[in-house]
């Protein structure tokens, strides 16, 4: 890697990764000293699966796992978040393009691929235990700041019981490729093409999850009318879906995801000073 001082640092996300742009090669260095298996090895493996299935994702240019970094393809600095946020009219047209990419992603059958260490990585299942632990972040980090101590124990017990009951009512099986963070800030726009980034957390899970991530995105304010149009377009392009069952899963997973996000944001503030 070049002298890091000569590289342009790019604004990161909520993770412990750092990103530096190499203008000479139009690439990005992803540096990860913590969770490097997920942030480097698994990230590359998932990108390979996406690319294999003709979905635009960062190609690996070089790697130095020993020194905690990989170099990947750069898709510019324009996200679909910025495009949609600044668009006064016809936001739905952009969302239709995104839904088509989601549909393509949900057709992925590959669950195993070799990473850059030439070892097979298998995409794991998005089990209810993971969904439960994610929702529990709300209880662990947000609730203690909002309730007096005497009420926390009772609330936690009731909360956990309710979440477990709700999870048991999910209709759709875990049989679909799930990005797990599929929203407009993780979709890059370059040369009239959309690229998918930040896919290291992908699992095989419920078909409704990524649509819930996209439509009920806490970072992007959209009207209920637009949300409904995007949902209906997805249903229209997925004829085999049982609407009532799917909508119930969509609503439940959206609630669970947003409980997780509230917990994560509070943890970032309290534990990580971000």
Spell out what each predicted region is.
Residues 1, 110, 121-122, 129-130, ...:
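An alpha-helical support segment within catalytic cores of ATP-dependent transferases
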Residues 4-21:
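ATP-binding glycine-rich phosphate-binding loop
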Residues 17-23, 105-106, 163-211, 218-225:
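Active-site acidic catalytic loop and adjacent metal/ATP-binding pocket
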């Amino acid at each position: 890697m070049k002298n890091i001082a000569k590289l342009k640092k790019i604004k990161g996300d909520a993770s412990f990764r750092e990103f530096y742009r190499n203008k000479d090669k139009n690439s990005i260095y992803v540096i990860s000293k913590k969770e490097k298996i997920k942030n480097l090895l698994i990230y590359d493996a998932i990108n390979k699966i996406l690319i294999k299935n003709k979905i635009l994702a960062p190609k690996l240019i070089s790697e130095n796992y020993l020194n905690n970094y990989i170099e990947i393809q750069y898709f510019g600095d324009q996200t679909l978040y910025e495009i949609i946020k600044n668009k006064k009219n016809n936001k739905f047209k952009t969302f239709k393009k995104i839904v088509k990419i989601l549909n393509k992603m949900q057709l992925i059958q590959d669950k195993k691929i070799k990473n850059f260490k030439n070892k097979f990585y298998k995409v794991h299942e998005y089990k209810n235990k993971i969904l439960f632990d994610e929702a529990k972040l709300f209880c662990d980090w947000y609730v203690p700041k909002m309730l007096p101590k005497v009420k926390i124990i009772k609330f936690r017990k009731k909360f956990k019981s309710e979440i477990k009951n709700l999870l048991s009512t999910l209709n759709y099986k875990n049989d679909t490729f799930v990005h797990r963070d599929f929203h407009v800030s993780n979709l890059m726009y370059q040369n009239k093409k959309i690229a998918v980034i930040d896919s290291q957390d992908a699992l095989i899970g419920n078909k409704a999850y990524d649509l819930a991530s996209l439509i009920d995105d806490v970072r992007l304010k959209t009207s209920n009318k637009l949300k409904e149009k995007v949902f209906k377009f997805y249903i229209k392009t997925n004829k085999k879906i049982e609407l009532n069952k799917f909508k119930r899963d969509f609503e439940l997973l959206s609630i669970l995801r947003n409980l997780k996000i509230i917990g994560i944001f509070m943890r970032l503030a309290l534990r990580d000073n971000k």
